[in-house]
């Protein structure tokens, strides 16, 4: 039988499908996702869960003119498949390939770029208000998950949309089964009744008639209380109604017919409406259904032709988690905080061993930072483990609530530097630059996983804010000698040499080691310094380099502006340094998706490129 999926390229192609065809298409899409994403890597279980929801949205709305915003965006694969991008999945999340998130520059059907959570309602509301001011006619749809709805930004947007009654449709994709579908028939009946034209006209007429007298107003008030009491029993989210947003649901997010009926009617509802759909993460793939978190993001299938390298022992996340557990055994005031990332940040085991000292605040980085500040102000030693890209969401709180008060909060910044496949929204290349400008903040970086325990212990004992930044994954050079004693503001000379000194921080120190081996074959033997401290820099060592006549090359997995290299350059200018200096890092641009090794090579930060930079300097 000919594949339906192969005959579909654009949203309008769905209009001719009957119920049987749509059901068949759902199965074909799931099979395609499982086969394709298993090869390239990507977000799997979340996309398997929204197949029917996406199909229903695309059959019910016209996304040639209607606009859709996908919160976070990693559940947009089905939408991409059905908007002419199916063939691009062979290069999903690869360098110059199809993005794993909505991208306006990728398709006319992508109306807003996303990557971080809780932004869709604000963005959709902005589009809706632009539509109204320009006197245009189209529907704006924001799709947000139950997890993203915990973000403060989403709640701020709900408050705004409900207050001004702006017309838009919000789809709450609840894939946690947190609200049972057993409300069943009565809920469906009330939803159908409340969407009906007769009900809304009658409601308006009654309010108009009775509202003209004091007795009538009293009757309306009593009727409203009775109605609210019933709704509290059968509709699980009076919360939305109280914010001024009409609530419909919950409805089965895998029942296309039921969703079509609801979606076709809400377009005519004036004001904001939220439709609560319940979906199953990993639907149609038994392994993902049993372990949706495990299959949330899957790695690419290994190339059988490539010889597997022997990786170093632990990931940085694992090393951090183990170190914190050991420290917590001795330091009873130590507590751990995460913003919905216990697995990714290495805190899962800590949460099991010390549940009363572990705090997962949900997708709420701003709250997490100030929570840590409050704990520190009252004698605890909080450690906030967070991805670099997400810490920037709590920028003001780090300044206002932590640094101004000089509170002892430790920031364990995971995924610092290039992270690869998720692209611009997830690269961790700015934390050094924005943290360096904050008074009282100290920034350190381990050169290897074995250095994390001593560095973390030092940070926790320091009575002021400390940020420890480390990359995703494992070391690429194993068995480096790890510092056991950390001295404030002091760098480490890890390899002596002549003529030029390479100053590198974090993983870039390992790249410097590999570059040195290449350079030695060409008659150049650089000195290598580990910038253990990114802030403050080791001014005394820099002055010694000047006196000894070294040229200097700095390497960092961060943007150059505001980074380590700029701090070094500033001090060298102050001491009238006359040697050659070169700064390696990322220029003033966002770094796209791609394999980490490819990106390092593209931006001149791999060992070969580093050695070539030095060779050009002398040739």
Curated annotation (Swiss-Prot):
Transmembrane portions of the chain: none
Membership in a protein family: Belongs to the transketolase family. DXPS subfamily.
Disulfide bond annotation, renumbered to this chain: none
EC annotation from Swiss-Prot or TrEMBL: 2.2.1.7
Keyword Ribosomal protein part of the UniProt annotation: no
SMART domains associated with the record: Transket_pyr
Protein name stated in the entry: 1-deoxy-D-xylulose-5-phosphate synthase
Biased composition (Basic and acidic residues): 302-312
Region (Disordered): 289-312
Chain residues that bind Mg(2+): 146, 175
GO MF entry, a single one: 1-deoxy-D-xylulose-5-phosphate synthase activity
Organism expressing this protein natively: Clostridium botulinum (strain Eklund 17B / Type B)
Catalytic activities: D-glyceraldehyde 3-phosphate + pyruvate + H(+) = 1-deoxy-D-xylulose 5-phosphate + CO2
Requisite cofactors: Mg(2+); thiamine diphosphate
Gene expressing this chain: dxs
This protein's pathway: Metabolic intermediate biosynthesis; 1-deoxy-D-xylulose 5-phosphate biosynthesis; 1-deoxy-D-xylulose 5-phosphate from D-glyceraldehyde 3-phosphate and pyruvate: step 1/1
Note on how the cofactor is bound: Binds 1 Mg(2+) ion per subunit.
Taxonomic path: Bacteria, Bacillati, Bacillota, Clostridia, Eubacteriales
